């Protein structure tokens, strides 16, 4: 039987804890129906016997205290409400235990913003990870030695797993159901909970808001210039001139501040503008393309699909109700 330890983090999202426990309970029930032994033993593990979660709205009582768990097979780090860095600091005392369990052979999985606490342990250094797309820039800034793949719904590498934004944790849980039981049971569980079992990409849900979580005012002004003039023919030399610095210095500072090249940033701004038009208007794909400054339909479609995870037409069909 797989011993599952759900961490009772301070400010944890209640649903992440409850849904995890409930899903494994349902899976055990399916197994018992077919005359098999339950596969998962689930416990809520905390540092204290009374934990405040969801911005102190609720109190939960862990089944067992951290110091009383010598070994577990799977550690679940739930998502946290509010500021991810503050939540990580609030729960930093879990980090040594998480690391020790991993070194003893346990798998460790983070949900949404829980990736910040997993990153804090140092276990993710040099490895892949995902989190909620809204935290992506902040995560990259504080953990540059981790390969963030924020377009992915889940990741799993060397016993370290993570899930993307909010409800992506359902796919993470199904991954463990399939791994420790069978594909057949994972499919049955997915149908029971009405989950798209093979959802792999959260790109269609990402909203690009600009990487402005930095202190370089000159680069912020350049970003604003791009966002106000994206429909025109922008080039790096032109934008550097508006900033009154050399192109080389501008490009270096831009990458340092935003984690994007200037060309990448321009593409992201253009595609975000296109997405908004496709969501709310009846304009054709070609009309939208011209409005954001593209002239080649194939190039536009390729760039759009690479960033949004689907074609412009598919994106419109997904979100537009006009």
What positions do the PLM features span?
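Accessory alpha-helical/coil subdomains and C-terminal extensions
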Residues: 180-224
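Basic, amphipathic alpha-helical hairpins
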Residues: 178-182, 202, 221-235, 254, ...
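N-terminal functional module of multi-domain proteins
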Residues: 2-119
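A conserved active-site-flanking secondary-structure segment within enzyme catalytic domains
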Residues: 125-153
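A short, Lys/Arg-enriched amphipathic alpha-helix from helix-turn-helix/homeodomain DNA-binding modules
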Residues: 207-234, 241-243, 264-283
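Short active-site oxyanion
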Residues: 103-108, 123-128, 159
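Conserved anion/nucleotide-ligand pocket segment
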Residues: 151-192
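Basic/polar phosphate-binding segments, predominantly the helix-turn-helix DNA-binding elements
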Residues: 225-227, 233-269, 289-314
């Amino acid at each position: 039987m797989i011993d599952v330890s759900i961490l009772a983090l301070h400010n944890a999202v209640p649903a992440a804890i409850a849904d995890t426990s409930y899903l494994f309970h349902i899976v055990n029930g399916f197994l018992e129906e077919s005359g098999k032994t339950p596969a998962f033993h689930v416990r809520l593990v905390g540092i204290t016997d009374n934990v405040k979660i969801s911005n102190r709205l609720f109190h939960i009582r862990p089944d067992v205290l951290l110091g009383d768990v010598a070994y577990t097979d799977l550690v679940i780090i739930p998502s946290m409400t509010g500021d991810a860095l503050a939540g990580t600091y609030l729960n930093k005392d879990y980090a040594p235990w998480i690391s020790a369990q991993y070194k003893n052979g346990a798998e460790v999985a983070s949900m949404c913003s829980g990736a910040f606490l997993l990153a804090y342990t140092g276990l993710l250094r040099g490895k892949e990870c995902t989190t909620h797309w809204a935290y992506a820039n902040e995560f990259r800034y504080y953990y540059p030695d981790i390969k963030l793949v924020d377009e992915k719904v889940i990741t799993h590498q060397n016993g370290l797993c993570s899930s993307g934004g909010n409800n992506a944790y359902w796919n993470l849980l199904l991954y463990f159901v399939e791994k420790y039981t069978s594909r057949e049971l994972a499919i049955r569980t997915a149908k029971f909970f009405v989950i798209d079992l093979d959802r792999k990409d959260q790109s269609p849900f990402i909203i690009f808001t600009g990487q402005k979580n930095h202190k370089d005012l000159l680069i912020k002004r350049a970003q604003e210039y791009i966002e106000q003039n994206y429909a025109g023919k922008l080039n790096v030399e032109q934008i550097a001139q508006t900033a009154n610095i050399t192109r080389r210095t501008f490009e270096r500072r831009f990458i340092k501040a935003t984690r994007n090249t200037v060309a990448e940033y321009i593409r992201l701004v253009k595609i975000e503008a296109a997405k908004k038009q496709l969501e709310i208007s009846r304009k054709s794909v070609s009309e939208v393309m011209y409005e954001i400054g593209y002239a080649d339909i194939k190039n536009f479609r390729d760039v759009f699909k690479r960033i949004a995870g689907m074609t412009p037409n598919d994106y419109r069909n997904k979100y537009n109700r006009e």
